[in-house]
Amino acid sequence: MISNFDCTDNQASSKVLRPPGGGSSDIFGSEMPQTPRNVKNRMASNIFAAEKDNGVKNNGDAPRRGQKTVDSHSRLFGEPTRPITPGKNHMKSSIPFGQNTEAVAAQKLLTTNGHYNGKSGSVSSASSSVSSSTENLKMNSGSRSVFRNMSKPARAETPIPPADDALSIDNSCRDSEVGDVPADNRTVTKSDQVNEGCQTRRDSGNNPEQPYSLNKMAGVSNVKEPLGLCPNEIKEERQACAKLDSRNPITGLGLNGDGVGGLKPKKLRIREGNPVTGEGYKANDFTQRQESSNGGTPVINKNRIPPGGFSSGLW
């Protein structure tokens, strides 16, 4: 026997869907999470060492899991606590005076490992300062002596007499002073100066009998060139065709009424008056009637102004 029982299920049905965006969505008034999101800071630089802060995660500064910590600063720029190199003594001269050059260079390479900055220690720095001061005194005294020698006036060198077999070009040059010019020798003539009036030339190499000077030149020769062209180069002038000049193939003017070779001549119509209003025309142009018999029935032809006048494009 079948009986119906009313059963109420207080449990939530599994068919209830979650709201869009999840249960923590802001549309349903839920509380915002208090923990910050884990967002990777991609703009952070990982060149320098990362700060050891457990509260900051995924910022790109800490190395990944399973990797060794790499100090990028020491790899790129060296150790931050490296020893400071002392400054180089620029006043110390590197030119040895009174010492064996090879021995000094070998000793310097052995003591400084190939590098020398002028200061190797307290004792060496004191000795180097003393040696540099003595070397500077030597250099200064030498430079002063050179300057004194240069400032002294140069002595006139006595010319060495040339050998007998020496050429004139090999002899040393000697400046000779020229004294005052005497009063009777004021007018100086050039050695190459000649009188232009005495210069002569010939017309041709075959005629030595006709020399002439620049002051007395021969007249212009009477030989004249022909003004026109030679007869063999004269071209006959072409006679223009009379038909081409006496007609116009477009308007028909000048065809003498034959109409050959072009359009027929167009008769010019001369009208004196207004074609629209009819003023200026003769009276018989509008009232002229031509009676013609067409089967016994008279036909009246009237010369009237067309619609729009004679200036219309239809006529």
Swiss-Prot record:
Q: Is the keyword Phosphoprotein in the record?
A: yes
One annotated GO molecular function is: structural constituent of cytoskeleton
Q: Where is this region: Disordered?
A: 1-37, 51-89, 116-166, 272-315
Sites where Phosphothreonine occurs are at 35, 81, 85
Q: Which Pfam families match?
A: JUPITER
Among InterPro entries, the record links this protein to:
JUPITER
Q: In what ranges is there compositional bias, type Low complexity? A: 120-133
GO CC, one annotated term: microtubule
Give the Phosphoserine positions (modified residues). Answer: 24, 94, 122, 133
Q: In which compartments does the protein localize?
A: Nucleus; Cytoplasm; Cytoplasm, Cytoskeleton; Cytoplasm, Cytoskeleton, Spindle
Compositional bias per record (Basic and acidic residues), positions renumbered to this chain: 62-76
Which residue intervals are annotated with compositional bias (Polar residues) in the record? 1-14, 134-148, 285-296
Which keywords does the record carry? Answer: Cytoplasm, Cytoskeleton, Microtubule, Nucleus, Phosphoprotein
The keyword Nucleus is annotated on this UniProt entry: yes
Biological process terms from the Gene Ontology for this record are: positive regulation of microtubule polymerization
The protein's matches in PANTHER family, at most eight in alphabetical order, are given as:
GEO05313P1, MICROTUBULE-ASSOCIATED PROTEIN JUPITER
Concerning its family, UniProt says: Belongs to the MAP Jupiter family.
Briefly, what is this protein's role?
Answer: Binds to all microtubule populations.
Q: What is this protein called?
A: Microtubule-associated protein Jupiter
Can you name the source organism? Drosophila sechellia
